[in-house]
A protein has these predicted regions:
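Short, glycine-/small-residue-rich phosphate/pyrophosphate-handling segment
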Residues: 28, 81-110
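Phosphate/pyrophosphate-binding betaalpha-module
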Residues: 1-47, 51-54
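SAM-dependent methyltransferases
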Residues: 105-106, 110-142
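Short, acidic/small-residue loops that bind anionic groups at enzyme active sites
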Residues: 3-14, 47, 61-87, 100-101
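General structural feature for long, well-ordered alpha-helical segments within catalytic domains
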Residues: 33, 53-56, 81, 115
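Glycine- and other small-residue-rich loops at beta-strand/loop junctions that grip anionic moieties
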Residues: 26, 49, 77-78, 107
Length: 142
């Protein structure tokens, strides 16, 4: 298990830090929070939530679709909760407003093991130490 950092937003109602995080950072502005969430995350796990959750979900999907962020796994937990959204995605594909390949950005599941395997596969692929090819040998170009 890793260190969990929560990014909270200061609102006049409802928000309090997640009790399951080791560190909590509170932001005054949504846009700063969203930028830092994406910048310092290896993946997103989307849980059932309200407008703020959906806003972050759509922003991240858009960044992945437009290749602003690459190979960023988005795990959607709560298959039943998100089934209408899943159907809406299929309607957008049928209407031609998004491509079939845009579905690859999301994994819909209820399984913690499946979610962790999906994220682990991505991390192993994208965050490994790779040997660097030597560019110089005795100061000569190769």
């Amino acid at each position: 298990s890793g260190h969990s950092v929560g990014c909270n937003i200061k609102l006049p109602f409802e928000q309090s830090p997640n009790p399951y995080t080791q560190t909590s950072i509170t932001f005054s502005y949504f846009f700063i929070r969203k930028v830092l969430l994406v910048k310092y995350s290896y993946a997103f796990i989307i849980m059932p939530g309200g407008f703020g959750t959906q806003d972050e979900f759509f922003e991240t999907l858009t960044l992945a679709q437009t290749k602003v962020i690459n190979d960023f796994p988005i795990v959607v937990m709560g298959k039943e909760y998100y089934e209408p959204f899943h159907q809406w995605i299929d309607q957008m594909i049928a209407a031609g407003t998004i491509g079939q390949e845009d579905k690859k950005f999301m994994l819909f599941t209820d399984s913690v093991d499946e979610a962790m395997e999906h994220i682990s596969k991505y991390v192993r692929k994208n965050y490994t130490v790779k040997p660097r090819k030597r560019l110089w040998w005795l100061f000569e170009k190769v």
